[in-house]
Amino acid sequence: MFSKSRWLLKDLARLCTILKGVTYSQTDVGTENGIGMLPILRANNINENQLNYQNLVWIKRERISQKQLLQAGDVIVATSSGSKKLVGKSASFLGGKIISCGAFCAILRPNSLINNLFFKYFFQTQSYRNHISSLAKGSNINNLKNADLANIQIPVPPLAEQKRIVKKIEELFAVIDKTVKSLNDTKEHLAQYR
């Protein structure tokens, strides 16, 4: 079904723009929904390849450049943490909010050479995690530099094949979701008989 013969290894820097998250100080921090304030995602808002919007920091809008505002399809990567396990964790931003991320995160904005969903799924692979583990550096805080991200190589098939792969992945996820729901329903039914 899929042909790897036309796949090319491409550096991440050729497939996206890599942006640093917003640097801010305590004097820039304000209250939730305050006038002139925008929310900031931090590394702790990335959980199991999803963004959670709890415990956001709100900072002055003027601290955030236009290009640092997240766009649908952006992938947010944690670039610094006290734990090597947390460095490199990522999630895709689906849109619908005016928001950015903090300086301990990077924003990866895919270009037209790669399908947004194919790009997103790459960051969920064991190959990506292994690569990040080998790159994470530092004694007290593990850091991932933008240059480290830029040099990650991604196997990239032609766009039409990327779309077919994404379609297949999403079909399989739908089967998994249906199976999990069925198992949970069965557990509930069994619990009634105990």
Model-derived features: positions:
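Short coil/turn segments at secondary-structure boundaries
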Residues: S25-N33, S134-A136
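Heptad-repeat alpha-helical rod positions in long coiled-coil/spectrin-like domains
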Residues: K178-K181
